[in-house]
Amino acid sequence: MGWSCIMLFLAATATGVHFQVQLQQPGAELVKPGASVKLSSKASGYTFTSYWMHWVKQRPGRGLEWIGRIDPNSGGTKYNEKFKSKATLTVDKPSSTAYMQLSSLTSEDSAVYYCAR
């Protein structure tokens, strides 16, 4: 039996029109089914701890699904019930970086993932 891979694309968006605000995510990730992956979003141009960071999923031909959000100041999280056992949100304040770990990956997890301020 051969093996397959799951493709995860990463993108970022920031609210408002302030051109210096940036959320940087690396490119695509290719992982095997059953594995875990940790996605990152590095913020710059604003006070990282002043805004919640949201994570959103979009599968081809489907609408956006809100995964959850994290308060970078306190580390407090809120999840969409659907993703509670799939996603874990964390932050690293010194580097102004938000993370989302996705576990037990399946083909259903192949999507574009956005971080959004």
From Swiss-Prot:
Residues 20-49 are annotated as: Framework-1. Residues 69-85 are annotated as: Complementarity-determining-2. Residues 86-117 are annotated as: Framework-3. Keywords: Adaptive immunity, Immunity, Immunoglobulin, Signal. GO terms for cellular component: extracellular region; immunoglobulin complex. The keyword Signal applies. This germline gene belongs to a set of closely related genes that could encode V regions of NPb antibodies. This is Ig heavy chain V region 1-62-3. It comes from Mus musculus (Mouse). The lineage of its organism: Eukaryota, Metazoa, Chordata, Craniata, Vertebrata. The gene is Ighv1-62-3.
